[in-house]
Amino acid sequence: MVKKKEESGHSPLVNKKAKFNFELISFIEAGIVLSGSEVKSLRDKKGNLTDAFAKIKNGEVFLENFSIAPYKNGGYANHPEIRPRKLLLHKKEIEKLERQVKEKGLVLVATKVYFKNNLRVKVEIAVGKPKKLHDKRDDLQKKDAQQEIARALKSSNRYQ
């Protein structure tokens, strides 16, 4: 029998604000170009995706505002905390993303960074539409209503 490779023991870095600030339409997985100290920092969960977004420049995609803390044992060879990092995508994927961003006014947002097969760092990019303030309020009201219903059901089941 063929053994499956174990999944990574590392939990992914997730951009929790992305779902709140954007209406996410489609997702795409991309590789990322990193230095050795950046990979080691990510294994220690020292990254921050909160304000990260992707830009397309000259047919290449770059991840901006992705903060990776300097590696504690990096010494002189450490990396800068915030810098544009190149994403690895096929040309057709880049062209498709570029069309969506130009035509529909959509935004490329980084939603997740994770290790695939415990070896390669991957970034999940979402194509999203920015939400307006009233959309955010509506989402919060729906979420609160769902929580109230769940609490009511839980308390009614408790006394039966």
UniProtKB/Swiss-Prot annotation:
Subcellular localization is given as: Cytoplasm
Q: Has UniProt tagged this entry with the keyword Cytoplasm? A: yes
Q: Which CDD domains match?
A: SmpB
The leader peptide range reads: none
Spell out the GO cellular component terms annotated for this protein, sorted alphabetically and separated by semicolons.
cytosol
What does the record list as GO biological process?
trans-translation
Highest rank taxon of the organism: Bacteria
Protein keywords: Cytoplasm, RNA-binding
Molecular function via GO: RNA binding
Membrane spanning stretches: none
Q: HAMAP family from the xrefs?
A: SmpB
Cite the NCBIfam families for this sequence. PRK05422.1, smpB
Name the family: Belongs to the SmpB family.
Describe the task this protein carries out.
Answer: Required for rescue of stalled ribosomes mediated by trans-translation. Binds to transfer-messenger RNA (tmRNA), required for stable association of tmRNA with ribosomes. tmRNA and SmpB together mimic tRNA shape, replacing the anticodon stem-loop with SmpB. tmRNA is encoded by the ssrA gene; the 2 termini fold to resemble tRNA(Ala) and it encodes a 'tag peptide', a short internal open reading frame. During trans-translation Ala-aminoacylated tmRNA acts like a tRNA, entering the A-site of stalled ribosomes, displacing the stalled mRNA.
This protein is called what?
SsrA-binding protein
- Source organism phylogeny: Bacteria, Pseudomonadati, Spirochaetota, Spirochaetia, Leptospirales
